[in-house]
From Swiss-Prot:
PROSITE patterns: THYMID_PHOSPHORYLASE (PS00647)
Gene Ontology terms: biological process: pyrimidine nucleobase metabolic process; thymidine metabolic process
InterPro entries, per database record: Glycosyl_Trfase_fam3 (IPR000312), Glycosyl_Trfase_fam3_N_dom (IPR017459), Glycosyl_Trfase_fam3_N_dom_sf (IPR036320), Nuc_phospho_transferase (IPR035902), PYNP-like_C_sf (IPR036566), PYNP_C (IPR013102), Pyrmidine_PPas_bac/euk (IPR018090), Pyrmidine_PPase_CS (IPR017872)
EC number: 2.4.2.4
Full protein name: Thymidine phosphorylase
An example molecular function term from Gene Ontology annotations: thymidine phosphorylase activity
Length: 443
């Protein structure tokens, strides 16, 4: 028998907690035998004294096991259970293409996603723009769609990782969100509860990233790779660029449109293509569906070009209650804003730098993101045709199109866009879309 206050004292003094102590404390978080004050105190102790890798693995697995852990064995699936997770960005619509692409190559992707908060968009919010799509189906429907379509993208259900829900809300209110140990456990407990064989982790770097510096992003990527592999799930982390909007747009309905255009081949943003292919190729290799990076890319390009990935996206949408002809007729179903108008820079030159976070916040002010959890969204608003770094900007080339519901909302967003995109005399040096891969062998 352990005492919560003794566990807190031990960590406060910088000692290492045993797996049993961590399991006891997490059990207390779940069944309310540990108080809010005690949870806050342990969070602060970990924030200052940190945890070693064994402690992080113990915390992650205890939180994973605090609720239902999905088991796919009895479905008789003929491929690996694979997924990806992103730390969040602006115009990060990767999941919508990656899930169907991986499924088209023989994987099964039970993707449990989140809603947007702050400047980052949420995958579920994008699907809420599709009429009829159920982001919170019962587990039978979720399993059915995963088996039949190969992919289902839904929200976190109440019986998955209850310990994280309680712990996270307390961390949020007590300034301990930024601990790498606690971020690692929070992200991975939710992902690993989906019963994954392999995971590709997308850790963003730059002005629109969750972590403030490249070094902090790399530290998080290393922690996630070590802990996930330690918990028995093959995992690689990719450090990817978020110094500019990833897709050509940011919002909800506008990003769904870009995803469909990507899958059908109507338009593929080159940056979005590179990061999507990098993550998806890693998933295929980790899941044993491809022998090499080149083999994986060949398979992925094939399912894009022959329409199989687009077909699977359509089947997933129909399976979860959306329109059966969504791929063919998405324009009929997606909401459109009252005003769609260009924004021009005050001078000519080159797009030299971008405050991606501010562009994400411009979408929030339009009504396309949340200021606080529970806010209702306008799925039609956002930005499209956002320029890329290095683009030549002239008086007749817009830096973005703003989709707004009123004149005042348009003016406010247009001013924010002009402020966020800096025009210089010279094009900046090109940065890679993927900075590096962190595999288990690199640790």
């Amino acid at each position: 028998m352990f005492l919560a206050q003794e566990i807190i004292r031990k960590k406060r003094n910088g000692e290492v907690l045993s797996t049993q102590e961590i399991q006891f404390f997490v059990q207390g978080i779940t069944n309310n035998t540990v108080s809010e004050g005690q949870i806050a105190a342990l969070g602060m102790a970990v924030y200052f004294k940190d945890m070693n890798m064994d402690e992080r693995i113990a915390l992650t697995t205890a939180m994973r096991d605090s609720g239902t852990v999905l088991n796919w064995k009895n479905l008789g699936l003929d491929g690996p259970i694979i997924d990806k997770h992103s730390t969040g960005g602006v115009g990060d619509v990767i999941s919508l293409m990656l899930g169907p692409m991986a499924a088209a190559c023989g994987g099964y992707v039970p993707m449990i996603s989140g809603r947007g908060l702050g400047h980052t968009g949420g995958t579920l919010d994008k699907f809420d723009a599709i009429p009829g799509y159920q982001t919170e189906p019962d587990s039978d429907l979720f399993r059915k769609v995963v088996k039949e379509a190969g992919v289902a993208i839904i929200g976190q259900t109440g019986d998955l990782v209850p310990a994280d829900k309680r712990f996270y809300s307390i961390r949020d209110n007590t300034a301990t969100v930024e601990s790498i140990s606690l971020i690692t456990a929070s992200i991975l407990s939710k992902k690993l509860a989906a019963g994954l064989d392999a995971l590709a982790m997308d850790v963003k770097v730059g002005s629109g990233a969750f972590m403030p510096t490249y070094e902090a992003s790399e530290e998080l990527a290393r922690s996630i790779t070590a802990v996930a592999n330690g918990a028995g799930t093959k995992t690689t982390a990719l450090l990817t660029d978020m110094n500019q909007v990833l897709a050509s747009c940011a919002g909800n309905a506008v990003e769904v449109k870009e995803a469909v255009d990507f899958l059908t081949g109507a338009y593929r943003n080159p940056r979005l293509y590179e990061v999507t292919m990098g993550l998806c190729a890693e998933m295929l290799q980790l899941g044993g569906l491809a022998a090499s990076e080149a083999d994986a890319r060949e398979k992925l390009n094939r399912v894009l070009d022959n329409g199989k990935a687009a077909d699977i996206f359509g089947r997933m949408i129909a399976g979860l209650g959306g329109p059966a002809d969504f791929i063919e007729n998405y324009a009929k179903y997606l909401p459109q804003s009252q005003i769609i108008r260009p924004v021009y820079a005050d001078r000519s030159g080159f797009a030299a730098s971008m405050d991606t976070r501010e562009l994400g916040l411009a979408v929030v002010t339009l009504g396309g993101g949340r200021r606080k959890p529970g806010d209702a969204l306008d799925y039609s608003v956002g930005l499209t045709q956002v320029c890329a770094l290095g683009d030549e900007i002239t008086s007749d080339k817009p830096i973005a199109m703003v989709h707004a519901q009123s004149e005042s909302a348009f003016e406010e967003a247009a001013a924010a866009v002009k402020k966020a995109i800096h025009i210089g005399d010279e094009a900046p040096e090109k940065t890679p879309e993927i900075y590096r891969y962190i595999r288990q062998s690199d640790l």
